[in-house]
Amino acid sequence: MSSQQFPRQAVSMPPPQVSNSGASVGQNVQGDEVAREIDVQSRDPLGASTVLPSRDDKQEPVVVRPYPQVQMLTSHHPLQPAPSLTMTAQPAHLTSAVPLSFSENILKTPKSTMPSRPIAPAPPSALSAVPKVSGQGTVTMESGLPQTSAIPVATISGQQGHPNSLHHIMAATNVQMSIIRSGAPGPPLHIGASHLPRGAAAAAVMSSSKVTTMLRPASAQIPSAAASQSATQHIIHPPIQSRPPVTTTSVSPAVVATVSATRAQSPVITTTPAHAAEPVLRPTLAFQQHPPPAAISIQRSAQARDAATTRITLPTHPALGGQKPQLHAMTQKTLFGTGNPVAAATVAPILATNTLPSVTTSGSAPHTQVSTSTIVTMTMPTHSSHATAGTASNIPVAKVVPQQITHTSPRIQSEYGTERGNLIPIPGHRASPNPMTMEARSENRQPVPVQLQYFLPTYPPSAYPLTAHTYTPITSSVSTIRQYPVSAQAPNSAITAQSVASTVHLNPMQLINMDTSHTRHIQGIQPAPVSAQGIQPSPFSAQGIQATPISTQGIHPTPINTQAIHPATSITNQGVQTSSVSSQQASSEPKSSVVLAEGATIIANPINSSFSATPAGTTVMQSHSQSPGIGSSPAQGSSPRPSILRKKPATEGLSVRKSLIPPHPGDAVSPRHDSALRSTSASPRPAGAKPKADLHVSVAPGVTGDPGAADQPSAAASLPSSHHPTAAVPSPPSQPVSGPMPSSIHITPATIPALSAPPPLLSNAPSGAVMPEDKMKEEAEPMDILRPVSAVPPLPPNSISSPLTVLANNISGPAGELPPGASPRKKPRKQQHVISTEEGDMMETNSTDEERCHAVKPFTSRPEKRKSPPKEYIDEEGVRYVPVRPRPPITLLRHYRNPWKAAYHHFQRYTDVRVKEEKKLTLQDVANQKGITCRVQGWKTHLCAAQLLQLIKLEQDVFERLTVLQEGLVPKKKTATDDDLHRINELIQGNMQRCKLVMDQITESRDCMLKVLDHKDRVLKLLNKSGASRRLSKVKPKDKM
């Protein structure tokens, strides 16, 4: 998605931001071009050189990321913030600024980090965004994220920024996701204004700035509420800058958070994750803003959270304009303070684990840390954990994260080493179909999980044992399921828990991971604020993972916060923030939610922040899950077979989303669901704006819905959410808020259940989790039907929770369900040489299990409708209505099915044909042939010789007759003078000669032929000899036997 694709609204925003950023300012103004350049630069130079060296082992595989540099992040954790810087787009202008933003530490790291991944995902626009980021510490943060995740995430985020742009963003997100998945796209992920639609960019910027500010002033600001506010303000301006960083570094959660608003949800998410992770990984890394750099562990996180909170608020308010001040002012801060760990945890889980995105990178921690403070907030919100604290801003981040995860996954993997890799693969395994997935797929890319980067574990890095249980769940969920418990990753145990959350970031495919993260989150993080989310009664508790509306709605929650300051507070308090979310949604555009839902999931959040589409954020998270990931796929680009997946939207959608339909236009929902179901990863995009509304609904409601409804809605909503991302955001901003709410709520319950469920899985999850589990399972089931991995996608509506749910399902309930659909992508292909005779079969060959499941369900529901057409009736006026069945146009083609039988009778390739090698007969073989003695006698030869004799006799007869004729003519001397006689004579003579010649030759041939029989005796002798021996030899072995 080049920056061109989206208007550079954010860019305009930048100037204010710039001020914050300082160096950034110029860049922002400059616009995409500069950003692009920077992107390129960072990507190429930094990414290639810096990143690469760093993480040779696994990260290289990370290459999957479109942004190789980021991959390079291989340097992984250590991810130097430098890469972050690059991310920022600082490259050109920001560079200096970035240092400013980050503390010295961060600065160091950033360079290397930046290249890591940040750059790749973002399109050129991202670059522009980078400039915005420029000044930001964010950038540095990002660099921490650089692992990979960040970039993708950021991208998404940015896109989400605008409701209308949503589609674009979605596209961008998808693209970016694709990039991430494929690793092909070079463009850095910088989430830049360019990337985002104008509106989105602006919003992102605002959101971002909050984060950014934090990063920059970080130490001072974060500590106090006042500082917080201040930071918020600053952030607003630098948001873009921040975001780019985000983009750059999924790892730096802090940065990401900021970014979310501005440019890429991805970055935003990243930011938060980074932050969260950072504390665990590298308190030191924490931004200067985090005074507690010392505490690698949670402490840092907490502070960061505070900062993040503030920041978040800011982003929120930017989106909301009026609200923002309030938001960021105290509420946000409080949130963070209260749940700061939560936010961090969310992000950190994966990150902390090892990757926390880059930040997590222990070595890189410095820069990461920087991001941490800011990011934490952001990311968390995305998931549920953060939702409360930094929801607004963070949420966007979360959104981003999903994508990011994809990118990150490789990085994270790296960071985590093998285990990490596994983690990521889980998400990735599904990813295979979708790019995102890819990310996960590349086991190298451990960072994926990091993407979530929920910091939750951050504060409880040591405290929680999330490591082990946390990761495992994730894996399960993913299906890939590398069950590596995060425990392996234990190093960042706290983060590990978060990691799960991190997973959320994953794209559709990674969604599962995300879920897992969440679950983990819940488990690992529960004790802390995360607990609140999943475990803590506090703010997050309500939703469980989802509780933090932030998580599910987390994303929206944040936006909500942003949009409504009080909502933000609400979030903190409620954790679930149901009300807050609702109000928010009503007030702000639910679209945000939607946007994020799909691959854009991450984006949505950022957008939310900016646009106050908080709900969307949540959804988004889930959405990415869609890819099932494998589905996955998460982004449309990532989706393995987007076209195929999109084929049956109507049918599939319908079946799944019962609840959704009522709230939103059935058709919007239906398609959306379809899409989501069909291809969690790719489908979403196709969904139109309407879907967005649906999505929105899902998300918003995510807070706490009816369990029953949740199930259905969940499934429906989640699917939609994935679809919505694109369409959702733009179209239903206003409508969704009020209308969707109910639906949303329903869905939310589902999410919550899901969320809860995961905790049960984790076992850490305290209470609520269990109940949700039931729902979750139900939800999962529908999902499963849709597609095993789908389980996750359905959750999307709940976004964070949902993912968890899905994970839980996958892990627990889904285990059973998976078999049928098991890994959709892994479905055994039909043997190539067997060509099905039925069209249906052929279709199945290309379709995934998920698809099939979807088809089944939807079909069952639809057929019923079709079977019972309206019966004829007579109305009050006596008018008789007879149902007329619309007749399809008459076509010969309609009944034509391409039978593939022809393939059976034609060679498809050279290897299908092989020349038969004739076997040379041995004497024994010849001797043992039937009638060999008869043949030796030469009867055929004699027969032929007799016939030749007849020919000779015939020729002789002709010769004699010609002689007589000639003799009759010659005597007359007139022949010489008579031309005719002369000619006849000549002819006779010629014929006589021919007869002689033929007779001689035939005789000769006959003699030669008969000579063959001269050896008859000898041949018979040999044959009798060898023939006998052969028979004996055949008999002997039998005797021996």
Curated annotation (Swiss-Prot):
GO biological process: negative regulation of transcription by RNA polymerase II
Region Disordered, annotated ranges: 1-62, 111-131, 572-592, 614-769, 806-852
Subcellular location field: Nucleus
Compositionally biased region (Low complexity): 576-592, 707-728
Nucleus found in the keyword field: yes
Biased composition (Basic and acidic residues): 33-42
Protein name, UniProt field: Histone deacetylase complex subunit SAP130-B
